[in-house]
Amino acid sequence: MIQSESRLKVADNSGAKELLCIRVMGGSTRRYANIGDIIVASVKDATPGGVVKKGDVVKAVVVRTVKGARRKDGSYIRFDENAAVIIKDDKNPKGTRIFGPVARELREKQFMKIVSLAPEVL
């Protein structure tokens, strides 16, 4: 469950290392983001020579949360960290690699490129 001011790790090679959530997309009263939701975030830490720089405002999709997500069969999927992938306006990732596992819920929300690049889909 991600909200405004939450910090997330970046799970791609776009150059950013840490994000600060500014806004959850989807209406003015929307408070929390779960797996597969889009957020607006600020880059708080970045590697030199990356595509994105520290201070850039980017859109990202949440791929892992500590809170997890409930599935239709009643099971839950949870992760050890909150992580996101920086995306372009066409919902494709800015980076060319995805690090760590991603949840199956991303496939249902049409983030096919992220799912295909991920090393593991849980």
UniProtKB/Swiss-Prot annotation:
Its GO biological process annotations read: translation
Which superkingdom, per the lineage?
Bacteria
For this UniProt entry, the molecular function terms from Gene Ontology, in alphabetical order, are: large ribosomal subunit rRNA binding; structural constituent of ribosome
Q: Which GO terms describe its cellular component?
A: cytosolic large ribosomal subunit
InterPro entries given for it? Ribosomal_uL14, Ribosomal_uL14_bac-type, Ribosomal_uL14_CS, Ribosomal_uL14_sf
Sorted alphabetically, the keyword list is:
Ribonucleoprotein, Ribosomal protein, RNA-binding, rRNA-binding
Family in the record: Belongs to the universal ribosomal protein uL14 family.
Q: What does this protein do?
A: Binds to 23S rRNA. Forms part of two intersubunit bridges in the 70S ribosome.
The record's annotation in NCBIfam families points to: rplN_bact
Q: How does it assemble?
A: Part of the 50S ribosomal subunit. Forms a cluster with proteins L3 and L19. In the 70S ribosome, L14 and L19 interact and together make contacts with the 16S rRNA in bridges B5 and B8.
Q: What is this protein called?
A: Large ribosomal subunit protein uL14
